[in-house]
């Protein structure tokens, strides 16, 4: 990892999610997350390697699992993306990751499951609007 990559390069709100980790580990994880952000479009495989390193150090942090899922998705690693995105959704809640989860299912050759997930999201949004 380049020496000029520092934890403070990561958005303060994002770093707040790492407060459950000890300082040294949080710093290392933050630096890996910075690298993921920098490499995601230009080198998806290397971005995924950094996301995996962050996940190994902070597997119970929803943001880290979400980042690992997005990196795997960008690298075309559909099963890994699905695993990580589902874990992030369990940790964080919400429906914002459902489109990526559905598309990962499609990438695995399960378009029916993708449609089912998309419909469940639509149903959830309709129910929320009724409240």
Residue ranges and their predicted role:
Residues 1-31:
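N-terminal leader/linker segments that initiate helical-solenoid repeat arrays
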Residues 19-24, 52-60, 86-93, 120-128:
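Solenoid-like repeat scaffolds
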Residues 22-56, 67:
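Alpha-helical segment of the N-proximal tetratricopeptide repeat
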Residues 38-39, 71, 102-104:
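Residue-level signature for tetratricopeptide repeat
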Residues 40-42, 75, 108:
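Structural motif corresponding to the intra-repeat A-B loop/turn of tetratricopeptide repeats
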Residues 64, 97-98:
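TPR alpha-solenoid repeat register
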Residues 100-131:
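Histidine/lysine/aspartate-rich catalytic loop segments that bind and position anionic ligands
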